[in-house]
Every structure is written in structure tokens, then in C-alpha cells.
From Swiss-Prot:
This is UDP-N-acetylenolpyruvoylglucosamine reductase. The gene is murB. HAMAP family: MurB. Its cofactor is FAD. Gene3D superfamilies: 3.30.465.10, UDP-N-acetylenolpyruvoylglucosamine reductase, C-terminal domain (3.90.78.10), Uridine Diphospho-n-acetylenolpyruvylglucosamine Reductase, domain 2 (3.30.43.10).
Amino acid sequence: MLFLKNVPLQNLTTIKIGGRVSFYAEPSDLKEISLCIDFSKSRDIPLFVLGNGSNTIFGDVRGLVVNLKNLKGFKVKEIKGKFFVEAFSGTPLKDLIRFSVKENVKSFYKLLGFPASVGGAVSMNAGAFGVEISDFLKEVYFVDWEGKLQKAKRDELNFSYRKSPFPKLGIVFKVVFEFERSKENILPKYEKIRRIRKEKQPINLPTSGSTFKNPEGNFAGKLLEKAGLKGFRLKNVGFSEKHANFLVNYGGGTFSEVVDLINIAKERVYENFGIVLEEEVKLIESSGSDGWKVLGA
């Protein structure tokens, strides 16, 4: 298992911003995940699980970051017209999207464009165009905080808008999806969503994806745009000119710049509309002796 000290984190997130973490590990199996949990307990430091880093921005952190990128791959069983897909946590979500399009699977293609791992997508209950990844879950295997592998069926787990029981319950190890073939050709709809993503999202700049959750009955992007924040820039970071809810790094952005920008956005939206935006992106930094300070968790 790769295990390092004092590791820079900016290249481990999609926005390419980050400080350093005290310890960093890349486990490849269940035993090594358990060792990471034991290590964090023995040092009395917090542990944070990293997937593809698509909705996470780090400051300087006293703790252990566990990257699950080596836990990847999936296998498929087809039973009576349904696909049961077992995927490890570090599997890129795009690999399953590609499979679902090839097999004409109903609705899963709507999750295209998330640069996330399977475990990360499940942990944040990623969703778009009226579907959430939890809609397709059959069961989840996870490592609890005692280092033991557990299994839970979908109806035993509480998912809601951009929330899941993970990592509170433990570390997602692998999941089983249940897919159903569509009766109609999904390819035109898939291509339409792909065009929308390309036109409306900053695919050519480092980004953390959606910055804020949509308030009930509204859209964060529209509120930010009406508040004059579309294309707004603060030093080396800003909100995309394509989509106001996408935070981008123009090069050399820092964690403190991100925090300042997010605070400005929240203040402006509240002043204009009386709505308090909640972070979807996780901002993680050390907070004295108590370890992590996490916004958007």
C-alpha cells in the first residue's frame, strides 16, 4: 500500500486546488482499508475518504486522506432482462455510463458528466435530470469504522437530496446496481444531454462541479446569476461564464480564495433573495486540535 507523509492535494481534486495533508494512503483491498482505519485511531486523527475529488476542495489538513482509486472494476450479471452490476468504489462513474449506453439501460445515462468515482457518487447521492444514483442501487458493501465489511440493501439506507448515510456509516467498498433495459432507444436522449453539458458547463477549466445545492423550489445557478455572480472572478477563482453555479480555477487558485468567493456568493444571494445557500462542494481544512472543519458535508 502506498503510504506517504505531508502530501500536496491539489492534483488529487478536479479543481486543482489544495493544501497538504499529514498522511495519505492508497489502499488496494479490504485489509488495507482496515489498516488505515486503525492508523487514524492510533494517531487520534480524522480520516477522510477521497474518490475522484470532484466535489472536494482541501486546505491544509491534519489527518489521513484515503484515496480509493486502486479499488476499481466492475462485473455484470444479466438475469431476465435486468443487469446486476457489481462495481468497486474507485471505479470511474463514466465507465458505468459507457456500459449503460452500450446496453441501452434506462435513465442511468442522465448521470453523465460527473467526473466522480462510484463511491463518491454514492456518498453524495449524485443526481441530474430527475434521477439520483440511489435510484439504481440494490445493495452497498461498506467498511464500518471498526474495520469490518458490512452489507446493506437499498431500502435499509436513508438517501435524500445530495445526501447519503456515508461516510457516517463507513467507507463505501463496492456497490451493486440494478439496471433495466429501456424499451426505446436512449441514444438520442444521451446525445442531447451530452450537448447540454458541453454548452453549459466549463469543461475546459478545472472545476469542482456544482458549488451549491438547489434550494427547495429554486435553482442555485439562477439565483447566483440574478445576483450578478455569473462570470464573477475573485483573484484566481470565479464562477463560470457558462454556468453561475460552477466554481472554476483560472490557474493558481487557493483554498482561501475559494472560501472568500463562496462567502461573497452566499451574502449576495441572501441580501437579494433572503435565501441561504448550502454548499454542495465540500471544503475541508484543519480546525485546531479537533481535526476537520467540513462545509457542505
